[in-house]
Amino acid sequence: MFFKKANKIDNRIDTLVGADTRIEGDLHFSGGLRVDGAIHGDVSEQNSNPSTLILSEHGRIEGAVSAAKIVINGKVIGAVKSSHFIELQSKARITGDLYYKSLEMHTGAVIEGKLVYLGDNAPEDAA
């Protein structure tokens, strides 16, 4: 869990949900997604290519979240599942279970739910 180089987050953003944007319904993405607004629905990778989700301090997702790499500094109400790496920054608030292989949690981040380690041999449909 001390592998900074292996867990480096790709800074490339292909899709931006702006601060004044609200999406009702599921969102499927590929590449990099940054959420500054609100999403009421599930957010997941579109295909098998590893993708990155960044939820900013003012961003909010009400629904399940699934991506290879996830950085959260906002609020999620729902299960969060990462097939590779999750970083919870200081203002992260998660109400729901967190499924992870590698987790970095900053001081101040809050999880109201279970932490479930997926490990290397965990089934893909664990969440």
Where are these regions (language model features)?
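Intrinsically disordered, low-complexity terminal regions
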Residues: M1-E62, V71, I77, H84-A127
